[in-house]
Regions:
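Long, charged, low-complexity intrinsically disordered regions
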Residues: 1-41, 45-51, 59, 66-68, ...
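A generic structural motif
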Residues: 71-75
Length: 99
């Protein structure tokens, strides 16, 4: 096994451990003009991974959104559906808290 493959294997293991140990909080907040916004905090991902997950979420939920200061922001109230998508991505149910 080459060093590159070994490093990739470790990165995969670390990513899985991060998903298991993450404490993701999903909450809704009313923003400007009374518009609901879903916030996902505590995802413990690097910027690129978080941006990729945000893109998947936006496509699945047919909504707009962005990442700001490590927090995923989605337009609309998508708390339940966002939790289901995170479970499919490998996050455990006990690590997801819907507020």
């Amino acid at each position: 096994m080459s060093n590159k493959n070994l490093e990739e294997g470790f990165e995969d293991i670390i990513a899985e451990l991060d998903k298991e140990q993450a404490r993701v909080k999903i909450r809704m907040e009313m923003r400007r003009f009374g518009k609901p916004t879903t916030l996902l905090e505590g995802l413990r991902m690097n910027g690129k991974e978080l941006q990729e997950l945000t893109t998947k979420m936006k496509k699945s939920l047919a909504t707009g959104g962005t990442v700001k200061d490590g927090i995923m922001i989605l337009q609309g109230d998508h708390r339940e559906r966002a939790a289901e998508i995170l479970k499919k991505q490998g996050f455990t149910e006990s690590s997801i808290e819907i507020i």
